[in-house]
UniProtKB/Swiss-Prot annotation:
Role played: Probable glucose transporter.
Organism of origin: Saccharomyces cerevisiae (strain ATCC 204508 / S288c)
Keyword Transferase attached: no
Name of the protein in its database record: Hexose transporter HXT16
PANTHER family, per database record: GALACTOSE TRANSPORTER-RELATED, PLASTIDIC GLUCOSE TRANSPORTER 4
Compositionally biased spans, kind Basic and acidic residues: 545-555
Length: 567
């Protein structure tokens, strides 16, 4: 691979250029307008995708990893917040004093706000910063929102006995993380090869689970401090995570779709080539660029996208927007944040003296389960993952809630809890998290990232993701009140939501495994019934076997197989 650009400075010029590897003599303007390649260039044959060995796969994942690390930011907040609400010094700084007990405590309102203010910021940030992706490029936009995230962290660290200052910092902190929640999956979906797109977008969720796990570990390590280091150290570590993303953006290729929209065709070819480690003049690269260019030109003929365009029935953007909103809404209504936000509190209620340790166990299950999802999501399909996830989580939640209601307190709420029932609840919580982490957690982001045409993508993704954060706020804020009133009956509410999720996916969500982003648009436009969509073949490939069959031929085990010689 040729050397990278020598300048380490982060600015709009070097972040908006992905021509860091090779100088390319671009085709003439007529060739660009008519297509990037023709039969004479490729001898009348459709170019094949580059063959990858283990090293080829490794390079792709390493190049995409800094983008996916944006998922670490909201995960880290979930992990540390779950510990903060049970820390003595944190309650002393931001809670109220109870004279009858001589202890500090967090009221339900303040606890709910502490957990939920981050989600408010994320919801606003996702919509507010999405436009930067179209004006400044995906990479520079990510750097900007990460800087906003750092400002929020500074405000939180400097808070001292002023809970309102801490909450303002939490909102600004969320603005940056919310921007990442839209921009990072967007960039991942646009630079990922079609056959690896699901796994690469899943890396965002993998890093979110990694953030939750390390967040749990950090508060476990600082819980015995008696001063403000108890909570300031975990917040201060945010600067390290932000720095990783900012430096990583110097290495990641820019979105070829964004570059082609800006008429920077040769840079788009270099961006595509960088991912698969081939020449920018390779016929496969030119074919990919041609397909993207055709899609961009088709969208351009329809005129500049407006917010009104999101409600278009003719192009079925409205249908896809509703799908994106509901999938992101259902992601929260699985009940996963019931465990992640209030994990330490829940497990203290079932008789465990150290809920921090149990939270680390749950974080470990969550992280390693998501690794499985990254490896298999492009082999199984989106619909199957979501349907299996909804059914299996429903079974686990029914058992969890039933044990909590019927068996946990055999002598009433004021009596001692049953250790056996508490242990059983922890086991089924682990099963639940496994089912969630391997299905809905990564696939919900994949569905949203690949559903929308590039013309309205930033707007549609920002609205869809905003609903994720809105529901996370509602669940985070109201859970203390609801559990205080109905206790473990709360689980049955999520069971009802899981039933609705299963039915919606079966009847309304099409399968997009093995399709390029441009082919996904054709799938929606042709109006294929979702339960028949797995066998749909795009016009350019009709006469061949179904894409689902072809995808399955490439077993994920190939990724782990060491060839005799690396690419």
């Amino acid at each position: 691979m040729a050397s990278e650009q020598s300048s380490p400075e982060i600015n709009a010029d070097n972040l908006n250029s992905s021509a860091a590897d090779v100088h390319v003599q671009p085709p003439g303007e007529k060739e660009w307008s008519d297509g990037f390649y023709d039969k004479e260039v490729i001898n009348g044959n459709t170019p094949d995708a580059p063959k990858r060995g283990f090293l080829g796969y490794l390079i792709i994942y390493l190049l995409c990893y800094p983008v996916s690390f944006g998922g670490f930011l909201p995960g880290w907040d979930s992990g540390i917040t779950a510990g903060f609400i049970n820390m003595d010094n944190f309650k002393m700084n931001f809670g109220s004093y109870k004279h009858s007990t001589g202890e500090y405590y967090l009221s339900n309102v303040r606890m709910g706000l502490l957990v939920a203010m981050f989600s408010v910021g994320c919801s606003i940030g996702g919509v507010a910063f999405a436009r930067l992706a179209d004006t400044l490029g995906r990479r520079l936009a990510i750097v900007i929102v990460v800087l906003v995230y750092m400002v929020g962290a500074i405000i939180q660290i400097s808070s001292n006995h002023k809970w309102y200052q801490y909450f303002v910092g939490k909102i600004i902190y969320g603005l940056g993380a919310g921007g990442c929640s839209v921009l990072c999956p967007m960039l991942l979906s646009e630079i990922a090869p079609t056959d690896l797109r699901g796994g690469l977008v899943s890396l965002y969720q993998l890093n979110m689970t990694f953030g939750i796990f390390l967040g749990y570990c950090s508060v476990y390590g600082t819980r015995k401090y008696s001063n403000t280091a108890q909570w300031r150290i975990p917040v201060g570590l945010c600067f390290l995570w932000a720095l990783i993303i900012i430096v990583g953006m110097l290495l990641v290729p820019e979105s070829p779709r964004y570059l082609i929209e800006c008429e920077r065709h040769e840079e788009a070819c270099v961006s595509i080539a960088k991912i698969d480690k081939v020449s920018p003049e390779d016929p496969w690269v030119l074919k990919q660029a041609d397909e993207i260019n055709a899609g961009v030109l088709a969208q351009r003929e329809l005129g500049e996208a407006s917010w009104k365009e999101l409600f278009s029935v003719k192009t079925k953007v409205l249908q896809r927007l509703i799908t994106g909103i509901l999938v992101q809404t259902f992601l929260q209504l699985t009940g996963e944040n019931y465990f992640f936000f209030y994990g330490t509190t829940i497990f203290k209620s079932v008789g465990l003296t150290d809920g921090f340790e149990t939270s680390i166990v749950l974080g470990t299950v969550n992280f390693f389960s998501t690794i499985i999802a990254v490896m298999v999501v492009d082999k199984i399909g989106r619909r199957k993952c979501l349907l299996f996830g909804a059914a299996s989580m429903m079974a686990c939640m029914v058992i969890f809630a039933s044990i909590g209601v019927k068996c946990l307190y055999p002598h009433g709420q004021d009596g001692p809890s049953s250790k056996g029932a508490g242990n059983a609840m922890i086991v089924f919580t682990c099963f639940y998290i496994f089912c969630f982490a391997t299905t809905w957690a990564p696939v919900a982001y994949i569905v949203v990232a690949e559903s929308f045409p590039s013309k309205v993508k930033s707007k549609a993704m920002s609205i869809s993701t905003a609903f994720n954060w809105l529901w996370q706020f509602l669940i985070g804020f109201f859970t203390p009140f609801i559990t205080g009133s109905i206790h473990f009956y709360y689980g049955y509410v999520f069971v009802g939501c899981l039933v609705a999720m299963f039915l919606y996916v079966f009847f309304f969500l099409p399968e997009t495994i093995g399709l390029s982003l441009e082919e996904t648009q054709l799938l929606y436009e042709e109006g294929i019934k979702p339960w028949k969509s797995a066998s749909w073949v795009p016009p350019s490939r009709r006469g061949a076997s179904s894409r689902e069959t072809e995808a399955k031929k490439k077993s994920w085990k190939e990724v782990l197989k060491f060839p005799k010689s690396f690419n």
